[in-house]
Amino acid sequence: MPPKNCTHLGGCNSDCLTRSEIQALFREAINTLKHTMNTEDVCAHMLDIVSFERIKEYIRANLGHFTVITDKCSKRKVCLHHKRIARLLGIKKIYHQEYKRVVSKVYKNQTW
């Protein structure tokens, strides 16, 4: 049976990736481009929509090959988290603004 995509609700039998791990993955993808001398737009900021688009396409195209290895688990397939990665790649705010938005949403609608 193929693995289910992560819904971030814990039922996918796959450890969810943290935002830090996803950011590290983005950095490693950019480092791979640099290592292969494919340096066009590697210094682009995520909010620079036009320049960063090439980096986003590279990440999307290679999600099936990426694996995050940490002390938690050695076989966390990144492709299971493609929706979360797409959302993070699509954020059009600086992270401080996004953090404030998420925190205010969570604390506005407390569920615990």
Swiss-Prot record:
<dbReference type="GO" id="GO:0019058">
    <property type="term" value="P:viral life cycle"/>
</dbReference>
<comment type="function">
    <text>Involved in late/very late gene activation.</text>
</comment>
<comment type="similarity">
    <text>Belongs to the baculoviridae LEF-11 family.</text>
</comment>
<dbReference type="GO" id="GO:0006355">
    <property type="term" value="P:regulation of DNA-templated transcription"/>
</dbReference>
<dbReference type="InterPro" id="IPR009429">
    <property type="entry name" value="Baculo_LEF-11"/>
</dbReference>
<protein>
    <recommendedName>
        <fullName>Late expression factor 11</fullName>
    </recommendedName>
</protein>
<keyword id="KW-0804">Transcription</keyword>
<keyword id="KW-0805">Transcription regulation</keyword>
<dbReference type="Pfam" id="PF06385">
    <property type="entry name" value="Baculo_LEF-11"/>
</dbReference>
